[in-house]
A protein has these predicted regions:
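Extended, low-polarity segments enriched in aliphatic/aromatic residues
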Residues: 1-110
């Protein structure tokens, strides 16, 4: 479904209603999800929020891929894995190009 999910998001009744995107990245699964074995669970300690759904997806995606590479689950990003984000960018749903995303990090240490 991920290869075509951009089509659903581009549907006019949905497209104009998405104004804030929040992704819970406090605890995540980097392999075998959604009900992964404990060795594939990690604490990203992150909440992603933005008005651009594609940019939020891209930043979250990059976090998971980096963890997969760090843990030896894969050696590099798989070709075409971001196709759904590139398609969403073509539909002008948001920005998939990491170089064009304005990322603001806020550290909330207790």
């Amino acid at each position: 479904w991920h290869d075509t999910c951009a089509y659903a998001c581009a549907f006019p009744p949905l497209r104009d209603k998405v104004v804030l995107n929040i992704a819970d990245g406090l605890t995540g699964c980097f392999d075998g999800g959604p009900a992964a074995n404990p060795q594939f669970i990690c604490h990203y300690n992150t909440i992603l929020a933005g008005s651009d759904p594609v940019a939020v997806d891209r930043i979250g995606y990059d976090m998971v891929i980096a963890k997969r590479i760090e843990e030896g689950v894969q050696e590099e990003e798989k070709a075409g894995a971001r196709a759904f984000m590139d398609m969403a960018q073509e539909f002008k749903l948001g920005v998939a190009d990491k170089e064009k995303i304005e990322l603001v990090e806020i550290d909330l240490q207790a």
